[in-house]
Amino acid sequence: GAAMVGKRPIAEIQFADFILPATNQIISEAAKMRYRSNNDWQCPLTIRAPFGGGVHGGLYHSQSIESIFASSPGLTIVIPSTPYDAKGLLLSSIESNDPVLYFEHKKSLSFLKGRSARRILHCTFRKSRC
């Protein structure tokens, strides 16, 4: 809704494992908005979702579900691997005119260390480094 009227909403799913009930809306609605409207509409939506195992999350908190979305036309998937990439990819995700799934590995939220850029940094999608 908000993305359709000029806003750039950022949604956060507590765990990526819980995104599955929203799969139809993400793939069939948001990702195809530009195509369905013949380029008249865009859907600048960023969805953040921590994913992955190795953090003692158990059965429902350890899945890596990014492959479910990876082949969806109109949807961009980003997974940062460094603090530097995390900042740049998040800013680029927010500025994108198409929906972006911003997956963060749960381990990276606590254990990843490194420097991020002090300046405003933008990453180009489809490149490995900012």
Describe the role of every protein-language-model region.
Residues 1-130:
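Conserved thiamine diphosphate
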